[in-house]
Structures are given as C-alpha cells and as structure tokens.
C-alpha cells in the first residue's frame, strides 16, 4: 500500500513538473500548442521542514537561486516539506525522476539541510546513471563518495569576531541560543563566539549564558514565540537587565524579533534586518545567496568543485556593523586586528 502511495505521489509530482514550471520569478503554464517541452536547465531545491520564511538562511538561498535563474534563464522548483517524513518522500521522488530521465535536460538538485544527510549519502550514486543530473549538498564539511558536490560555510571566524567585539556594547549580559549540540554549523558557530568572548583582554565582566533549544540531532530549528519569550525572561537576573540575544537556531530572525522588548540588544545571524526598536550593532552575515549564485554559474560551465569550505577570509561570511565601528574605536578596539586573528584561527581549523 505504501509503495502504491509513493508511486501515486511520484506521478502527481511528475505531472506538476510538466504542467507548472518556474522561470526566474515568473510562474507559467505550459502552452499545449508547444511542440516540445522546455529544455532549459532545471534547478530543484529542497529545504528543511517548515524552514522557508525564516528571513535568514533559507530565504537567502531562495533569493540566490532566483537571482541566478533570472540571469541565466533556468527553471527552478523549490520544495519545503511540512515534516521530515514528507521531506524524505520528496527526496525519493526527485531521485527517481532524475535517475530515470531519458532527455538531455541539465538538472541540478540542491539539498540545503543536514537533516537529509543519511538519505543523500546512501542514494547519491543513483544519479550516476544520468550524466545530465548533478547534486549539490550544503552544510557539510565531509565530501560525498561518488556523484555530487558539497559546500560548507564555516561560521567560526565570523562568530569569533562577534564574540570578541560584542562585550564592548552597552548591555548587561549575553544569551547565546543554540539549536542543538550536534549540528556541525551550529556547534562551530557557538565555539567561535565563546572563544572570541573569552579572548577579550582585559576581561569585561558581562555574563555569557548558553541555552540549547533541543538535545536531539537536527532539533531546535523551529521555535514558537512563547518559547522565545520564556527563554528571554528566564535569562534576566533582574527586570531591568539589558540582555543581548545571539540566536543560532530556528526563529533567529523572526520569533525573537517579535518578542523582544523595546530597546533590547540583538546580534542578527545569517542576514541583516533593521529593527528600529532594537539595538543590533553587530550582524553576522552568511553570504549563501551570492555563493549559490556563483555555484550555479559554475554548474552551467561544468566547473562546479567537488568540495569547498568557505569562511571569513573567502567572503562566505562577514560582519556588518549597523552604526559603523566608531563605538568600538572609541574604546581603542582594533577591529581589523580582531578580523585577522579570527581568519587565522578559522584557517587553522581547516588547514586553509
């Protein structure tokens, strides 16, 4: 019964691909008078469950892919499952469609989340039967055996800078919220921030509290507003404490924004979103949109690398200072010096 259900979904999915495609940001129906279906390259992206609309990492991926689609005239399909089970069903359908395709249409499948790691590594060789199909797997530092490319953007250096510079801001304590203690990008971001914070000399006495949203691998990437509010309130030692939130988790750029009291302190993660009622002088940026734009160009030119690890030195990450760096220079902080230390420490981790 389950097998019949899967084939029914595959049939419906194939019909959807044939009936409604996406070229850049324009959705159109196939003209029945056309003699041949489109042969334009197709990029399909799958996101983690309920992750689009996060105003950070996933939304930047969407923008990067669509910018490339508009530039190169490729078709795109974005899939956001409601659950892990639905995500695995989507993956199986995509792999079946790509490995069995009889045409010469170039197809790139982008898996954006490490929650699909087991499936990707068990099934990537299936695509070797189609020389026009390729795979790009994000958020892993371990290359695939067999077909497919991998890309990892290391947050250690940028978060080291943020941890080193943030204590100079005008708040009472730091709250570092991490999704879980297992996801590599989250763990390394946390390590970078803590190492940077501990490197400040002379020591600035501002407590650093660390909170994990989940103890499960892959957990902590969905966050209700009520949970965000509870975490924030539990951190305050006193009602008048000024807490600076550093969220490397689900809800980083939406749930926490909605519950933060006026004049709160915040370090934006992945993207910069101006908030008039909050102080977010430091913003840690992951340039996944521009990186993906470049990757798709390399895929079109058949030069996509097998694996790359990018970071602060490569432009994969950066810091954006909302109000410039004058407030740091007033305290004789050498921002460029901190950057060079962060780049060196990040490079030592990956032997760059």
Predicted regions and their residues:
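Hydrophobic alpha-helical segments within soluble ligand-binding/sensing domains
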Residues: 150-174, 284-303
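Bacterial lipoprotein signal-peptidase II cleavage site
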Residues: 21-27
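Hinge/cleft segment of the Venus flytrap/periplasmic-binding protein
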Residues: 294-352
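Extracytoplasmic "Venus flytrap"
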Residues: 37, 43-64, 68, 79-88, ...
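An alpha-beta-alpha
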Residues: 65, 160-205, 306-330
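Periplasmic-binding protein-like
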Residues: 45, 101-114, 136-138, 238-250, ...
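C-terminal motif of bacterial Sec signal peptides marking the signal peptidase cleavage site
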Residues: 16-19
């Amino acid at each position: 019964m389950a097998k019949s259900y899967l084939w029914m979904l595959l049939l419906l999915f194939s019909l959807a691909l044939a009936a409604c495609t996406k070229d850049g940001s324009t959705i159109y129906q196939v003209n029945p008078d056309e003699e041949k279906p489109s042969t334009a390259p197709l990029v399909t992206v799958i996101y983690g469950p309920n992750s689009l609309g996060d105003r950070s990492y996933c939304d930047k991926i969407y923008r990067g892919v669509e910018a490339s689609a508009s530039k190169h005239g490729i078709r795109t399909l974005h899939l956001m499952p409601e659950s892990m089970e639905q995500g695995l069903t989507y993956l199986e359908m995509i792999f079946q469609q790509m490995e069995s395709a009889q045409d010469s249409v170039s197809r790139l499948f982008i898996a954006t989340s490490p929650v699909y790691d087991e499936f990707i590594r068990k099934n990537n060789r299936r695509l070797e039967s189609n020389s026009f199909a390729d795979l790009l797997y994000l958020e892993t530092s371990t290359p695939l055996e067999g077909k497919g490319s991998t890309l990892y953007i290391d947050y250690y250096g940028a978060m080291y800078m943020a941890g080193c510079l943030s204590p100079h801001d005008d708040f009472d304590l730091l709250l570092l919220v991490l999704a879980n203690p297992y996801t590599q990008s989250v763990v390394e971001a946390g390590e970078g921030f803590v190492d940077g914070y501990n490197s400040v000399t002379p020591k600035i006495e501002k407590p650093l509290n660390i909170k994990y949203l989940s103890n499960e691998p892959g957990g902590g990437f969905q966050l209700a507003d009520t949970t965000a509010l509870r975490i924030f309130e539990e951190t305050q030692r006193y009602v008048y404490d000024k807490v600076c939130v550093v969220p490397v988790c689900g809800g980083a750029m939406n749930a926490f924004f909605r519950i933060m009291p006026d004049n709160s302190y915040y370090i934006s993660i992945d993207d910069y979103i101006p908030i008039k009622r909050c102080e977010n002088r430091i913003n840690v940026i992951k340039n996944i949109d521009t990186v993906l734009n470049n990757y798709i160009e390399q895929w079109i030119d058949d030069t996509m690398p097998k694996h790359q690890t990018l970071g602060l030195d490569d432009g994969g990450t950066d810091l954006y200072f909302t109000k410039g760096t004058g407030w740091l220079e007033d305290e004789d902080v050498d921002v460029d010096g901190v950057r060079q230390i962060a780049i060196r420490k990040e490079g030592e981790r990956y032997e760059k």
